[in-house]
C-alpha cells in the first residue's frame, strides 16, 4: 500500500545505470486486480498506481548491451498476508498464455510469411477457446529490428509489407503476445501479457533463455532467479 508503479519503474532505471548499461525504451509497470474498472487499452495506462496485496503486476522492460537489445514482459503476483502461493485462477490464466505461445511458435516454418504464421496461429488459438492477440517483432541491433513482423496489437489481420516477408533461419524475435482470460473470482477479463526473446534456426524454434511458466511471487523469500 506504499510502493507505486512509478517507484518500481525508476528503481529499475537506476539499477540499469548502476550496472553501466541502458534501456532502449522507458519501462512499464502496471497492475490488474479485482475491481469493476474496464480492462485498460494499449494506448492508455492502468488507473492503479499504488501496488496492493493480491495485485497481478505486469512489467515491460528491455536493455541495450553489446550492441544488442532485449525486450521482455513478465507477470508477478503480490502475496496477501498468510499466502504462500498465487491463486489457482491466476496460475491457470498464465497457462493459457503459454498455450498461445506454443501454438504460435510451433507454426514457425522457414519460408512462411509473418502474416501466414500469424493468421494460422490466431485461428488455431480461437478454435481452442483462447482469445489472443499476437504482435511479435524481430529483435537484434534494434529493439524492433529488420525482418518479418507477426501482427501488431491494432493489426491482427496481418501487417502489409513487413508481414509479407518470409521467415528465415538464424533470426531472433521478441515473442510478444497476450490472451484475455475471464476470471470469475474477479468478475472481469484480465490480459496475460508475455514477451520473451526466441531464436529460429536449423533445429526449429527455441527460447534463448527459457520463458515464464510460473508467476513471480512478490513477498516470497525465494529469489526468482533461484
Predicted regions and their residues:
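Active-site neighborhoods and metal-handling regions in enzymes and metal-associated proteins
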Residues: 1-226
Amino acid at each position: 500500500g506504499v510502493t507505486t508503479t512509478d517507484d518500481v519503474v525508476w528503481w529499475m532505471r537506476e539499477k540499469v545505470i548502476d550496472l553501466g548499461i541502458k534501456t532502449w525504451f522507458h519501462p512499464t509497470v502496471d497492475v490488474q486486480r479485482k475491481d469493476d474498472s474496464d480492462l485498460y487499452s494499449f494506448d492508455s495506462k492502468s488507473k492503479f498506481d499504488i501496488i496492493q496485496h493480491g495485485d497481478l503486476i505486469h512489467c515491460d522492460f528491455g536493455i541495450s548491451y553489446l550492441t544488442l537489445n532485449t525486450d521482455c514482459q513478465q507477470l508477478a503476483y503480490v502475496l496477501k498476508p498468510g499466502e504462500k502461493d498465487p491463486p489457482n485462477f491466476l496460475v491457470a490464466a498464465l497457462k493459457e498464455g503459454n498455450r498461445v505461445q506454443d501454438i504460435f511458435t510451433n507454426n514457425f516454418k522457414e519460408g512462411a510469411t509473418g502474416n501466414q504464421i500469424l493468421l494460422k496461429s490466431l485461428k488455431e488459438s480461437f478454435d481452442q477457446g483462447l482469445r489472443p492477440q499476437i504482435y511479435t517483432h524481430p529483435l537484434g541491433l534494434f529493439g524492433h529490428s529488420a525482418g518479418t513482423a507477426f501482427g501488431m496489437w491494432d493489426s491482427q489481420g496481418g501487417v502489409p509489407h513487413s508481414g509479407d516477408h518470409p521467415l528465415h533461419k538464424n533470426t531472433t524475435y521478441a515473442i510478444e503476445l497476450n490472451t484475455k482470460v475471464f476470471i470469475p473470482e474477479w468478475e472481469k477479463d484480465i490480459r496475460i501479457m508475455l514477451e520473451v526473446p526466441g531464436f529460429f534456426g536449423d533445429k526449429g524454434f527455441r527460447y534463448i533463455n527459457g520463458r515464464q511458466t510460473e508467476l513471480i511471487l512478490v513477498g516470497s523469500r525465494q529469489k526468482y532467479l533461484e
